[in-house]
Regions:
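Serine-dependent protease modules
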Residues: 1-167
Length: 167
């Protein structure tokens, strides 16, 4: 089972609508009855520029640092990042905003509160600092639509193999 913790601390059971292992995105559904939720506003990265201030919201290290906010700037608007395992190329916003384990999947927002990306990764290697990445809303929107409509990303090649032990 999956649970979601809302910004006010309310814990809700969630249903997995769909997920995409290539982009590490998942779509969850909760029952909104009586929760007084406000929908996020999403915005294209086209209105963003290098050096714009952005905020990352997440739970670095887990629930202990619930709903932490870090601030930084956009270092690159359309950085192509290739997954070394799958070869898939994602279009990302590069930012110096602190992105830590637990932030992944949280929103990257502009100063108007619009979600412009979904935090996804950072470079962790000697000689690199403050290189975080967020999948742009423009890249994520069609994936999220496919997850909502089909439970998976349509027209992406998959290899469905089941393994069994030979007796």
């Amino acid at each position: 089972s999956v649970q979601v913790v809302l910004s006010n601390g309310t814990v809700c059971d969630a249903q997995i609508v769909g997920f995409d292992t290539v982009t590490d995105l998942a779509l969850l559904k909760i029952d909104p009855t009586g929760l007084n939720l406000q929908a996020a506003t999403f915005s294209s990265v086209e209105g963003c520029s290098v050096a714009d201030t952005v905020l990352a919201i997440g739970n670095p290290g887990g629930i202990e640092f619930f709903s932490s906010v870090t601030k930084g700037i956009i270092s690159a608007v359309d950085r192509s990042i290739q997954d070394s395992d799958t070869g898939y190329v994602m279009h990302c916003i590069q930012t110096d905003t602190a992105i830590n384990p637990g932030n992944s999947g949280g929103p990257l927002v502009d100063l108007y509160g619009h979600v412009i990306g979904i935090t996804s990764s950072k470079i962790v290697a000697s000689g690199y600092e403050s290189m975080g990445f967020a999948i742009t809303y423009d890249e994520a929107a069609p994936i999220i639509n496919d997850l909502m409509n089909y439970g998976h990303v349509k027209n992406r090649a998959t290899l469905n193999i089941s393994l069994a032990l030979a007796s």
